[in-house]
Amino acid sequence: MGTDDRLPDRPGADDPGRGRRIGIDVGTVRIGVASSDPDGILATPVETVARDKRDKTGKHVRRLAALVKEYEAVEVIVGLPRTLGDRASASAHDAVDVAEQLARRIAPTPVRLADERLTTVSAQRSLREAGVRARGQKAVIDQVAAVGILQGWLDQRRAALAARREGTDG
């Protein structure tokens, strides 16, 4: 399936159950990483992984895999940049490539794609409102975007699981 055909996954589908999740915001220079608590309620920033597009050894993917192992993640959520018209953005190809490389390294832990429209814009706004100057944003913007991606997934997952329970209880 081509990148243009890749749609975001649905939270709660094929859910692995309780456990930490890792959220990833793929950028060309930096990759933001966030983690959830074991109950999947709250996303928090973890780190920013440096990335060199000329590096063909995949050092950034190895670091991401090490974080998945360190946090004992049951699921990884990678932001999939889509345009407002719901098409794959230029960055989507890169995000899918990183997600696929990571999936090969951490199998059988599932790697999901989540719609990340406007997460970086939202992260910049949040940092600006918190009084963080533009210069200081560079260091944390990717982590804040990863938190946004993961928190959105966690919230949608919780709603999907609750709806599923209501459907079986009724």
UniProtKB/Swiss-Prot annotation:
It is an enzyme of class 3 (hydrolase). Pfam families: RuvX (PF03652). Residues 1-22 are annotated as: Disordered. InterPro entries: RNaseH-like_sf, YqgF, YqgF/RNaseH-like_dom, YqgF/RNaseH-like_dom_sf. Keywords: Cytoplasm, Hydrolase, Nuclease, Ribosome biogenesis. One of its GO terms (molecular function) is nuclease activity. Gene3D superfamilies: YqgF/RNase H-like domain. Could be a nuclease involved in processing of the 5'-end of pre-16S rRNA. NCBIfam families: RNAse_H_YqgF (TIGR00250). This is Putative pre-16S rRNA nuclease. It comes from Mycolicibacterium smegmatis (strain ATCC 700084 / mc(2)155).
